[in-house]
Amino acid sequence: MTAATWTGDAAALQRSYIVSAKYPVSGASGWLPHGYALCSNVLDAFRAFFASGGYEELGLASAVPLDAMERQAGSIKSFLDRIYLLRSGDEQAEPVALASTIEAQISGVMAAWLREGHRPPFRVTTVRTVGRHEGHGTRPLWMERFVWPFFEAQAAFVGDGSADTSFMLHATGGVAAAMGLPTVAVERLKEPGAAGAYADRRHELVTLLPEGTSTTLTSVYELGTRFSETFGVHSDGVPLSMLNFGFSARLVLALLVHAHTDPDKPVYHPSIAPVQVAVVPAVAEGAGRAAALAAALDAHGIRAEVFGDQRGYRARTTRARAHGAPLFLTVEGPERGGVLLLGEDVGEGRTITETEVAARAAERLAVLGETLCRRAVDAHRERILDRAGFPEPGDLARIPAAVRVPLCTAAACVSAALDQDVLDVIGRPTGENGAAYDAGAAPDRPCAHCARPTGSSVLLGRKFRGEK
């Protein structure tokens, strides 16, 4: 897999396992030549965002004491059948496990902070590798079993956590939208009367893929005080309430899918593109000039790379396009006067001079970024169809990806939505692309089950195979 290179050939993707039957894209961080750089740029965007909200990054170990997982299993929810145990040559050593989530581990850390006299609220993030053994079937998130990147945030506080919930759910949707990844924020429905063993409420950011299925990008769990009570996270005798946020490589992989709507020419948003400007010499003799231009762009903070493959112009253009660069700078040969063309593909665009390359590239990248975001949001909205009632099997061919159906909060109506088996229940939509819906402004429509007027709705669609 790590030797595979995207060449615009969908069959090659299948053979290299970058695309698989289990999930649209897998193994992106090991995909040559730039998968790791793409993942890192996405992580940096979320790191900066959480830092702006007062979150501090911790370097948590990937190994956690097995005792912490056992305490969680005894009073909250057990993951003991899904963890990897790490063995030591010393039989007397404390048994440890590979971390699968942050909650038990960070609860112990926060309890220690409180004993040392630190005061809440606590807001932290961490990025690391996690692992999980899914013995009952491979879940899309865990195709590699050991997952990197895994980004988590945890907030612990006394009192109302609605502002932190909105920050984790809706504001992060704005981060995703700004890199060309459209989202809908939803709250997961659960069977009326069912107690949440792990969390009081679960929120998600989902995206509707171009092929017509939905996939979950981020999750926000309202954990209540269950972890604080189990691990002794108390301030002045009061257990702290907790929120957990997380996303994995799945978010990056969904970003790849949206970027590859044209498999011959993927395009990444300038903010996260490993190569913002691909510099392509039309003839091999222009490689030196191309290198000087790329260096000038780099000096102005624009990520540029020269594609000077000696096998010929076609090889150069194919490799340049494979990097998903949003902008191309073509260095024409002597027969065309050595002109420079700046455009959205090789050999296209307006003629510019060497002295204006950096300024014009910066202007074009800003415009292209706005255009990509707008197109992604518009296309995403077209995948949602509004309906008055639950769909019938005969309606499926007319549903682009999902349907939004009015649904009130009555227990019988929630059960009716969960019981229908035509489409998967994605959740109750609460916002999109970083903006929360104004519940009071939503027009009342007859509930699909009881017909009472309601401003609430439910999103139904086809979840990607294996997703719960």
Predicted regions and their residues:
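TRNA-recognition modules of translation machinery and tRNA-sensing kinases, especially anticodon-binding
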Residues: 2-310, 333-468
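A short, hydrophobic beta-strand-centered structural micro-motif
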Residues: 316-335
